[in-house]
């Protein structure tokens, strides 16, 4: 049947990007475009719920914002989930963010989802699903303890 992890992103405890994982496979990631009109500091929480059926360890995450590497910290690691956090500073009107476990160009073109977040108008949209079934939850109502960002 193949591996299927679950991958979600929580932004500032207010927006959840759900089901960002691929339908099958050991990779997870997405491309984000964030529009804002002034400086913003956003706290990201990356939640991976691994499928241990065919793997021994979970791949790490790499994050780039406008081609600059973002420091990602692993904050929790249990059998049921692995949580990473990062702070991303938005200086430009448009910020492109790449989040991935594997940066193969083909994955961004045809597999990882592409999501647009307009922080000015509060319009959030899945632009391309590709090989995933993502959806956006706003406002976020955390239903797991590790989803709240205190």
Curated annotation (Swiss-Prot):
Keywords: Early protein, Host-virus interaction, Inhibition of host innate immune response by virus, Viral immunoevasion. One of its GO terms (biological process) is symbiont-mediated suppression of host innate immune response. It holds the Pfam family Pox_C7_F8A. Induction: Expressed in the early phase of the viral replicative cycle. InterPro entries: Poxvirus_C7/F8A (IPR004967). Inhibits antiviral activity induced by type I interferons. Does not block signal transduction of IFN, but is important to counteract the host antiviral state induced by a pre-treatment with IFN. Belongs to the orthopoxvirus OPG027 family. This is Interferon antagonist OPG027. It comes from Vaccinia virus (strain Ankara) (VACV).
